[in-house]
Amino acid sequence: MRLHATFAAHVNRYVTIIMDHPRVQAFMAEAKRRNPHEPEFLQAVEEVAETVIPFIESNPRYQGHALLERMIEPERVIQFRVPWTDDEGHIQVNRGYRVEFNSAIGPYKGGLRFHPSVNLSILKFLGFEQVFKNSLTTLPMGGGKGGSDFNPKGKSDAEVMRFCQSFMTELSRHIGPDTDVPAGDIGVGGREIGYMFGQYKRLRNEFTGVLTGKKPAWGGSLIRPEATGYGATYFMVEMLATQGESIDGKTVSISGSGNVALHAAEKCLRLGGKVIALSDSKGSIHDPAGLTEEKLAWIKDLKEVRRGRIKEYADAHEGVTFREGQDPWDLNCDLAFPCATQNELDGDEAATLVANGCKVVAEGANMPCTPEAIEVFHRAGVMFAPGKASNAGGVATSGLEMSQNSLRMSWTAEEVDGHLQRIMKDIHGQCVEYGRLDNGSVDYVQGANIAGFVKVADAMIDQGVV
């Protein structure tokens, strides 16, 4: 692949400048004082501040409004208890959250995550990222995030239903199609969305587009389950096109084996890529021959129906290796999609990826690469797309689902996929516009942050101090 020879040196100088920027340092010192013990949130804020504050200082329109100071404060944080009864008749109690971050350009929009690791720091980080991601789609959606420390794994359908009904009983007070429209995330799929939608309908006596990620039979959009993985792949296509390259013939390594990972793999296969790795929390599989449509269908059944472990794929297929406790980042590949969870790929693993020939990385999960990993990619001249840009396909299609609900009509899969491709192409174009460096290369982190900021900032200025 052709890469700009001076890219790494230019980025090194740029990173040094922004890290030594006194305004950035002062801003982050105050953010840390106000948000102690919230490392994930502060990590997300710092990444944005490092690029947006220099932009503000060079653009008088955005000065004097305390825009970034206001953006990092959620408009509303809701925390509540979620009591429910398990199959043995014992009462269990979990915590529920909804962080309504910013509504300057539309109703709050963002997923619900059910996982034991959920806490306020993680949800604030996700909600803050969502503000910029939703802005990049150009659709009228604000940013929010929510969830619970409930773990659906190992629970019966009846237990999951009772939990979802209890969770929605409180959440229903705070959401609505013109106020806040949640969706799914880790631990929240079609089953959970269905139970919550049913409870909302029961409580409010309204059949309305209050949630996205619904099944098509009752108000959902075609392509929604595939959208995040497909969108990340479409973004990768646009990145490669700037170098005169394509996915065809490239070796692809993907972490995760959930919704995003499997559909990124599916789209890569259809575009001629050779997908050699997937993973879950127990380890990763290496399939040197590459996945096929038949193999991928087997894994989808394993994960979505049987709810099994990726190791079972290695056990059932000759020539496939299961690597217990290992991520796929030490395998030789051309392209990488981190699609599992936040901070899964650190600096050492990034260095290994680079040494093994990886040239382009697109985040499928939210903030899966640590700051150290991103710096390694920049120094090596590896093209890197942050999740707020490359995984925006999911929320973009959620926005399309909202449009279909408002119009009381459904679009074909081809229509939705066409809209998705155009949106991802437009997001890439925005990143290039605001991320173009002096030497002609593109810093996608800078581009995504500034492009996302500008639309929200313009709306906040227009709407006054609220």
Each language-model region and where it sits:
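General beta-strand structural signal in soluble alpha/beta enzymes
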Residues: 179-183, 206-211, 254, 277-280, ...
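Generic secondary-structure signature for well-ordered alpha-helical cores
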Residues: 32-36, 50-61, 128-132, 153, ...
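Rossmann-like adenosine-cofactor binding region
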Residues: 283-384, 389
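N-terminal ligand-binding/catalytic initiation module
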Residues: 17-223, 455-459, 463
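Predominant activation on well-ordered alpha-helical scaffold segments within soluble catalytic domains
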Residues: 28-29, 46, 50, 120, ...
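Adenosine-phosphate binding glycine-rich loop
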Residues: 18-44, 239-240, 352-466
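Short hydrophobic alpha-helical segments enriched in small aliphatic residues
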Residues: 5-11, 15
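Glycine-rich phosphate/diphosphate-binding loop of Rossmann-like nucleotide-binding domains
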Residues: 212-215, 220-332
